[in-house]
C-alpha cells in the first residue's frame, strides 16, 4: 500500500480519487488526505505510529466515565471512524420527468419530406430534433419560436381515411430561418401510433404559454397539415417554378408513385374502404381533367420529371396539390343540423363534425356542446325542477378561464366575469364543467355550493359577510369530517384516472371570486373540497369524450345517487360488486352509433322545419304583394 503523498505525486491520481466511496474526509488540502484502506483495516479506530502508542478515546460500556488522556500522549490529528459506523444517507427525492423522447419515422422541413428517422426530445423550454444519422446536426427549436403546434391522430370520413399520427410545428416567420433549411415555416414529424402516450407526455411537458396547441377540425385541415408548403410567392408561370424546384432538390413529390393512391401511415389501415374511395377519386379526376389549371400543370410536371428515388413514400399523393382537389372535391363542409331549431345560442353541426363519431376518432367541441345542450333540453321537459337547479357550461368556459393575456398572466375570473351575468350560480345545486386538456376530455361537477350561502336574511344586509360568522364547521373539523352527498365539493370524473389538482384549484379560485363579486361573501378554500371519483376506465385513447358525455347523462338521471356512491365510503364498498351495472357500461359501447342516429333524426326534423318555414314565408310574401296592389299613390298638392 502506498502512502498518500506518493499517490498524490502520481500524475494519474487526484485528490478526489483518494476519497473513500462513502463520503469526503475532513480537510481541504491534499496534505490532509488519508490513504485509502481496505474494509478490514477500516475496522481499526485510528492509524498507529511506532513512536507513540495509540490512545483509545471511545467510551467503554462498563466504565461510568471517560478515561483521562496523559499530557505527553496526544491523539493523532485525524481519527478514522470505523467502517461499521459509517452510514450513507441518500434521501429519496421525487423524480420529475425532465425529458420525453418520441421516435419519429419520417420528418419534414424546408418544404419537403425527409424519409430519415430520428427522435424528438421534449423539454420544458425547447424541442430537439436528432436523426439516427449522426452526421446530421441536431435541430434546437425553442418554445419562444413556436407559433402553433398541431397534434394529428388520424382521420377517417367518407372520402379520406388515414391513420397518420404526426406533430406539425409552425414557426414564427421572423425566426424560421434560424431553425430550418429553406423557406418553409412548417415542420412535420410522423410517428408510430404505438407511441401516442409519449407524444401526449411530450406535448404536456412543453411550456404552452408562447404558442397554441390545437388539433385539426376537418379533413381539409388534416390534409393541409400533412402537406408541407413553401412560403415563397409563386410567379405566374407555375410550371417553370415547379421544374426548377424539382431539379434543385430531391423531393419525394418527384418519386415514382401510383397516380392515384390513398393517404397512408407507417402502420397499415383497413383496405376495404379504399375501393369505394378509389373509384370516387377516378371519377372526379375524369371530370376535372377537362379543366386545365395551374395545379394540374404542376401535378403533370411532377409526374413527368419523376426520377429514381424513394419509391416507398406513402405520402406523395397526400402532399401533391392535385390530390388536394380530388380527395376533397365532394367533402364540402355543409350544415346538416342547427340545434335547437330556434332561439339563441344554437349549435350548428356540419358533415365533418359527424365524422368525429366514427370509431377511433376524438370528439370535437361541437359534438360535446351539442349533446350537453340536448341533455339539458330533455331535462327541462322531463324534470323541470332539476333543470332549474342545474347549470351546464360550454366547452369554451374552462379554456377561457385558464387562458393568459398578452402579459402572460392567467385571466381567471376576469376572463369569464360576464358569463354569469344572468345566472346565479349559488342558487344552483349542480354545475357541470366539461374540460379538454391536451386533447383529453374529462368532467368536473360542482355540487351543493348553495349550502355555502348564509341562510339568515339579516346577514345579507351587511356590507361584508364572512363565512366564519355563519354556523359552519371549523377548518380543522372540515378536514377531518368525511364527505357526504350534501357536502360542497368539486368532483372530477376522468376515464383515464389522472389527477387534476390544477383544475380543482382553478375552479375553486373561480368560485371564491364569484362569491365575493356577486354575493359579497368571503369564502375559504377549505369550504370547497375536491374529490376524484372512481369511474370506469376507457380501453383506448379516443373514447374520452364518449365517457365524459356518458357520465353527464348518467348524473342527470340520478344526481343524488351518483354523488352518494362517489363520496360515501359505505356505499362505495357495497356497490363495488355492481360497479359495471351502476355505470351502465353496455351503453358506452353503442354510444357513437346512438349519437349518429340522434343527429340524423334531428337533421331530418330540422330540414322539414326549414321547408315549412320557407313555405309559410313565401305565402306571406304573396299576400303582401296582393295587398300592395290595392294601394294607390296620391299626388302631392300644395
From Swiss-Prot:
Residues annotated as carrying Phosphothreonine in the record are 526
The UniProt record lists the EC number as 3.4.22.-
The record's Gene3D superfamilies line, in alphabetical order, gives: 1.10.418.20, Ubiquitin-related (3.30.310.130)
Q: Out of the domains of life, which is the source? A: Eukaryota
Query: Which SUPFAM superfamilies did the record assign?
Result: Cysteine proteinases
Ranges annotated as biased composition (Polar residues): 238-249, 267-314, 610-619
What does the entry give for GO biological process? protein desumoylation; proteolysis; regulation of cytoplasmic translation
Composition-biased stretches, type Acidic residues, lie in: 620-631
Region described as Disordered: 1-79, 238-314, 610-638
Composition bias, Basic and acidic residues: 1-12
Major localization class: nucleus
Does this UniProt record's set of keywords contain Nucleus? Answer: yes
Active site: which residues? 440, 494, 544
* GO terms for MF: deSUMOylase activity; SUMO-specific endopeptidase activity
A cellular component annotation (GO) from this entry: cytoplasm
Q: Where in the cell is it found?
A: Nucleus
Low complexity bias spans: 250-264
What keywords are annotated for this sequence in UniProt? Hydrolase, Nucleus, Phosphoprotein, Protease, Thiol protease, Ubl conjugation pathway
Family the entry assigns:
Belongs to the peptidase C48 family.
Q: What is this protein called?
A: Ubiquitin-like-specific protease 2
| Gene giving rise to this polypeptide | ulp2
